[in-house]
């Protein structure tokens, strides 16, 4: 399905009852082909979705609320368009469910079907809200650099690394990531963490490269995969992981993670801007 056929940018009609058909899948293949990925993926990882506006009725009609987290594997054939996800979650509001487990099972079944792969779902009830973490991405901030730039479309030629020197291990972060929705043109604001082992990447060039996404149109997942591949090809690290946390829209935030080596899943901790 093409993004142009999704609910994005169209007048919204909110469902009165639970409706799984509201979920609008978008194949990953098209964007990946544009990046030159036509066979085996050069990475693995997860898209972490947090939903803060989930509510339903219990069997007696009393409203219930929870924060939901969805873990969508990067190898799934589809992503779900975010506005359709919002409308789908909104359809729970006037529908009765017998238990929290029933809601979780319904979410897992529907979102897994839309994505074409098994999606893990966690629900946090109000009595556990205090346990939800908030912290900034760990690493050396690139934003400390005072530099000039005038490139606002992705340009991998900005990237370079010291190929003739001994490899290093670094974790670098920036809060200056911005991209734009390919359907509505609305800006998407994010923070990005880059961990690598290999030739030392030029920090100023990397920051200019991150800034160069400022006028780019692409879904969150596609932008992170482009960043991953551009760094991999231009800088040739032995190990690479890219993790972005985008600010919330419509009660949802999307946090893609891509890596080419085995490591634990990153913490799903909100940043201050989320």
UniProtKB/Swiss-Prot annotation:
Pfam families reported in the protein's UniProt record: QueF (PF14489), QueF_N (PF14819)
Subcellular location: Cytoplasm
Active-site annotation: 181 (thioimide intermediate), 188 (proton donor)
Coiled-coil annotated residue ranges, if any: none
Binding locations of NADPH: 82-83, 249-250
Catalytic reaction(s) noted: 7-aminomethyl-7-carbaguanine + 2 NADP(+) = 7-cyano-7-deazaguanine + 2 NADPH + 3 H(+)
GO annotations of cellular component type: cytoplasm
UniProt record, GO biological process: queuosine biosynthetic process; tRNA modification
Assigned protein family: Belongs to the GTP cyclohydrolase I family. QueF type 2 subfamily.
HAMAP family, A to Z: QueF_type2
Descriptive protein name: NADPH-dependent 7-cyano-7-deazaguanine reductase
Gene: queF
């Amino acid at each position: 399905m093409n993004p142009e056929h999704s609910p994005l940018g169209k007048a919204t009609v909110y469902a009165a009852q639970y409706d799984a058909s509201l979920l609008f899948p978008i194949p990953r293949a098209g964007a990946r082909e544009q990046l030159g990925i036509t066979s085996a993926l050069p990475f693995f990882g997860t898209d972490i979705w947090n939903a803060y506006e989930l509510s339903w009725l219990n069997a007696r009609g009393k409203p219930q609320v929870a924060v939901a987290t969805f873990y969508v594997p990067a190898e799934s054939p589809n992503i779900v368009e975010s506005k359709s996800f919002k409308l789908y979650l909104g359809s729970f509001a006037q529908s009765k469910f017998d238990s929290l487990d029933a809601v979780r099972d319904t979410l897992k079944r529907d979102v897994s079907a839309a994505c074409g792969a098994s999606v893990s779902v966690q629900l946090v009830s109000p009595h556990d809200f205090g346990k939800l973490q908030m912290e900034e991405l760990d690493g050396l901030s690139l934003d400390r650099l005072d530099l000039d730039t005038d490139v606002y479309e992705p340009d991998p030629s900005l990237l370079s690394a010291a190929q003739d020197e001994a490899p290093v291990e670094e974790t670098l972060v920036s809060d200056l990531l911005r991209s734009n929705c390919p359907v509505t043109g609305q800006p998407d604001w994010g923070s990005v963490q880059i961990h690598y082992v290999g030739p030392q990447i030029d920090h100023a060039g990397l920051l200019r490269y991150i800034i160069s996404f400022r006028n780019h149109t692409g879904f969150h997942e596609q932008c992170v995969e482009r960043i991953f591949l551009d760094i991999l090809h231009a800088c040739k690290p032995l190990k690479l992981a890219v993790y972005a946390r985008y600010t919330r829209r419509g009660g949802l935030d999307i946090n893609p993670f891509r890596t080419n080596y085995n490591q634990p899943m990153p913490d799903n901790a909100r940043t201050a801007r989320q």
